UniProtKB/Swiss-Prot annotation:
Bilayer disposition of the protein: Multi-pass membrane protein
Record has Cell membrane as a keyword: yes
Protein name (record): UPF0283 membrane protein mlr0776
Disordered: annotated span: 1-33
Compartments it resides in: Cell inner membrane
Amino acid sequence: MTAPRKPAAFRIEPEAAPTQETPKARQAELSRKPRGLKTDVALVIPAEVDVFDEPDIVAAEPPPAAAPRKRSLFGSIFFGAIGVLVSLAVGLWTDQLIRDLFARAEWLGWLAAGMAAIAVLALVVILIREFLAIARLAEVEKLQKRALDAIARDDPKAARSVVDELSAFVAAKPETAAGRRALAELRGEIIDGGNLVRLAEAEILGPLDARAKVMILEAAKRVSLVTAVSPRALVDVAYVVFEAGRLIRRLSELYGGRPGTLGFFRLARSVLAHLAVTGSIAVGDSFVQQIVGHGLAARLSAKLGEGVVNGMMTARIGIAAMETARPLPFSAAKRPGLGDFLSALTSFAAKKDTETTGSGK
């Protein structure tokens, strides 16, 4: 048995109080005095550009059509003077011909005079029709500008005038009857100017836009097929020009333009000006890369691939013609792009390639 332990004293050191120092330090940090920072120097770190995240060029919307530049005053004077000289030359030649026929036989002179009178009368009628067609095309341009102005100012009165003029312009189109009737029922309603123009665009021009897209796709398919089977490149170019001209005229007639011969040339010039402004007249490397990216080069033969490229060029011309001949600019409806036609055209070309390969076997 051990002896009991003697009592002893121990020194106890005080513990640190972190709970008190930490709040004080945090409070001092939060309550520090404000200080000024230099704002004249900023460091901007640009984000890395991923080429695979770039928007598809065929899905991008083409810029709106720009108004064609007016001819200079001296150019108008020159062509006007040339026209007067040509008219005088034709008149003098006709007069001399009639005099010679009267000198040879009186009945021949009277016959020539009657034919000249009939020709002049027919020419006057043709010129009147051409001027009316040109005036109708000019009315389309004015209507587009007035619609843009009504949307920008949000003016209900100007928008109502635009809607009434649009309804009268496409009154001969049965596809627009339901839309015109719907707009007529809303005449007494209070609607903002911009919304009224957009509503008229969707209700009246919606069916015409659907038909226009079908026309453009069918024209692109025909160009693609003819390019695939034609033996010469000259035939391809000639048919592309022919199909593009026919597509421009059909789209103008669809939207109520009814262009004549002179009106067609003016419309074609406006379409080409739009293509030149938007840079869409040439198929660039980016467009070819998009076609290759869709796997077209691996699925189609060389001729059918060339046909798809020509078909997409025809579709681009059709889009420009659609925007030029449309009475209202694209506001409520989405402006069509090449992406709307590429999938259907490539499917058509792949089907034709499969049929050709199967028949060859």
